[in-house]
C-alpha cells in the first residue's frame, strides 16, 4: 500500500509533456534558430519549399535573428528569410479566415431570419469600421450592405505576395527598418516623432517609418491595408472573381492587380521575377501542421521560446 501511494505521489509531481501546437520564438541568433528548424526537420526543396507535403511547422518568429544581416551567403540568407516569414503568412491567413467565417455565419443567419441579434449587429459594425466599409444606409439595408462588402474584403492574402513585398521593401530583411523597427513594408506615418527617422531619402522631416512590437504585427497591418484601402479595390475585385470561380488564390494570378507607390524602379517586373524565381506559389498552396513540432525541444533551445 505504501509503495502504491509513493508511486502515485511521484506521478503527480511529474507533469506530462504536452505537445505544443505552436512555437513562439523570441530574441535569437541565426545559429540557434537554424538548430530549432533542423530539430523539427524544417527544410525542404531549396531549403524553404516544403514539398511534396505542402506542410509548414507553426514556428513563429517575433523578430529576425540578431545577426541576420551578417549572413554573407545571399542564397542562404534569402532562404532563411522565406523560412521565417512563410509560417507567419499562413498564421495570418488562418486568422483572416476565422474572421471571414464569423461574417459568413452572420450572413447565413441574416439570410434565414432577415434580422440579427444586437451582438451580431455590433460585430458587423466593428468589422465595417476595421475594413473601411462605410454607408449611410440604416436598418436591414445597412446590414446587407456591410455583409456584402465584408465578404469581398475579408479574405486571405496569398503568402507569396506578403513574402515578396517584404523582401523588396527591406532588401531581403537587411534594411535597418527591420532590425530597428520590425518593419517589413516600410509603412509611413506623418506629422509625428514616433517611428524611425528616414536616412538619406528626403529632406522632408514630416514623416517617420512606422515601428512595430514584432514582425507579425507589421505583416498583419499590411494585409489589412490590402483588404481595406481604396487603393486596392481592383485587387480585391479580381480576387473575388477568382474565389467565385472556386480557383486557388495564387500570387502569380493576383500580382498584376497590385500597384504600390514604391521608389523601386520596375517594381512590377521585380515582383513577378522574384515570385517565379523562388517558386513561392508553392507556399500559397501550403498549410500549417502542428504535428511537425510534436517533439519537445532540447533544454538548451527552450529558453528561446516565449
Predicted regions and their residues:
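Sec-dependent N-terminal signal peptides
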Residues: 5-13
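Catalytic cores of secreted/periplasmic lytic hydrolases that degrade extracellular macromolecules
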Residues: 19-164, 168, 172-306
Amino acid at each position: 500500500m505504501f509503495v502504491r501511494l509513493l508511486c502515485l505521489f511521484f506521478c503527480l509531481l511529474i507533469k506530462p509533456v504536452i505537445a505544443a501546437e505552436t512555437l513562439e520564438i523570441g530574441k535569437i541568433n541565426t545559429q540557434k534558430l537554424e538548430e530549432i528548424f533542423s530539430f523539427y526537420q524544417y527544410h525542404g526543396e531549396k531549403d524553404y519549399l516544403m514539398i511534396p507535403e505542402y506542410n509548414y511547422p507553426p514556428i513563429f518568429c517575433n523578430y529576425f535573428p540578431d545577426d541576420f544581416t551578417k549572413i554573407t551567403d545571399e542564397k542562404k540568407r534569402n532562404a532563411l528569410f522565406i523560412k521565417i516569414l512563410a509560417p507567419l503568412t499562413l498564421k495570418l491567413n488562418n486568422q483572416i479566415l476565422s474572421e471571414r467565417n464569423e461574417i459568413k455565419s452572420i450572413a447565413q443567419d441574416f439570410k434565414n431570419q432577415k434580422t440579427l441579434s444586437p451582438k451580431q449587429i455590433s460585430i458587423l459594425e466593428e468589422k465595417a469600421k476595421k475594413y473601411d466599409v462605410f454607408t449611410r444606409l440604416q436598418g436591414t439595408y445597412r446590414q446587407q450592405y456591410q455583409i456584402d462588402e465584408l465578404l469581398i474584403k475579408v479574405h486571405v492574402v496569398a503568402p507569396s505576395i506578403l513574402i515578396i513585398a517584404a523582401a523588396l521593401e527591406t532588401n531581403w530583411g537587411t534594411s535597418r527598418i527591420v532590425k530597428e523597427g520590425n518593419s517589413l513594408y516600410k509603412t509611413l506615418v506623418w506629422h509625428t516623432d514616433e517611428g524611425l527617422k528616414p536616412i538619406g531619402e528626403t529632406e522632408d522631416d514630416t514623416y517617420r517609418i512606422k515601428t512595430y512590437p514584432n514582425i507579425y504585427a507589421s505583416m498583419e497591418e499590411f494585409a489589412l491595408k490590402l483588404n481595406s484601402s481604396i487603393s486596392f479595390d481592383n485587387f480585391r475585385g479580381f480576387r473575388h472573381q477568382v474565389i467565385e470561380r472556386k480557383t486557388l488564390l495564387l500570387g502569380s494570378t493576383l500580382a498584376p492587380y497590385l500597384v504600390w507607390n514604391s521608389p523601386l524602379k520596375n517594381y512590377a517586373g521585380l515582383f513577378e521575377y522574384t515570385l517565379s524565381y523562388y517558386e513561392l506559389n508553392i507556399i500559397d498552396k501550403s498549410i500549417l501542421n502542428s504535428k511537425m513540432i510534436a517533439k519537445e525541444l532540447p533544454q538548451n533551445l527552450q529558453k528561446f521560446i516565449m
